[in-house]
């Protein structure tokens, strides 16, 4: 998830084939961004890209009940994000308001319980992350985070229909 007018740089190796990329975040109208045209199809060939995956400066692990975040969490660099869980997982970084902790996201998380698959974006400013990775999947994301407090959150829904964040995949961290 990227903040309005923001940008992100993520690298992931994909098997050759046809892919569809779309956004399920809801717009103020209630429609998903995909309905409004935020959809793209692309093809991955077996030709190797000219650029290699960037070298990682730190590792972040996605596990079935949480995150293993680097310590200290770097301000700048490339994070290698690996899903070590048995389910698909993602990580979105959200900026916490000054003086707030996890409580800043709790009302939003409660609203997701038993709600539909489509959801409004979290009420905190996104600061980057990596979209859903299959078990064993790895991606890199370039980060440039100001000093401050953040949340790492996974909003992928599990077999019971609830977002993983409701089962422990939400964690605060500080960037110095």
Which residues fall in each region the model found?
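Extracytoplasmic beta-sandwich strand-turn segments characteristic of Greek-key/jelly-roll folds
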Residues: 1-14, 101-145, 171, 175
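Predominantly extracellular/luminal cell-surface or secreted proteins
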Residues: 24-26, 93-99, 153-157
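Surface-exposed interaction/gating patches
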Residues: 57-101, 133-148
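Extended alpha-helical regions
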Residues: 123, 129, 151-153, 161
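Extracytoplasmic/periplasmic copper-protein system
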Residues: 28-68, 72, 84, 98-124, ...
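A short tyrosine-centered beta-strand micro-motif
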Residues: 17-23, 145-154
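Extracytoplasmic entry segments of secretory-pathway proteins
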Residues: 1-64, 78, 129-133, 141
């Amino acid at each position: 998830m990227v903040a309005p007018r923001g940008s992100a740089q993520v690298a992931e190796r994909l098997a050759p084939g046809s892919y569809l990329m779309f956004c399920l975040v809801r717009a103020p109208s209630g429609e998903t961004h995909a309905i409004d045209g935020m959809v793209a199809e692309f093809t991955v060939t077996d030709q190797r890209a000219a650029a290699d995956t960037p070298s990682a400066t730190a590792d972040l692990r996605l596990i079935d009940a949480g995150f293993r975040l680097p310590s200290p969490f770097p301000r700048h660099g490339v994070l290698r994000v690996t899903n070590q869980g048995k389910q698909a997982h993602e990580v979105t970084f959200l900026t916490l308001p000054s003086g707030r902790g996890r409580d800043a996201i709790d009302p939003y998380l409660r609203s997701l319980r038993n709600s539909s698959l489509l959801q409004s974006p979290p009420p905190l400013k996104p600061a980057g992350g990596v979209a859903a990775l299959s078990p064993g999947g790895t991606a890199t994301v370039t980060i440039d985070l100001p000093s401050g407090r953040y949340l790492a959150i996974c909003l992928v829904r599990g077999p019971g229909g609830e977002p993983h964040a409701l089962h422990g995949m939400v964690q605060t961290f500080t960037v110095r």
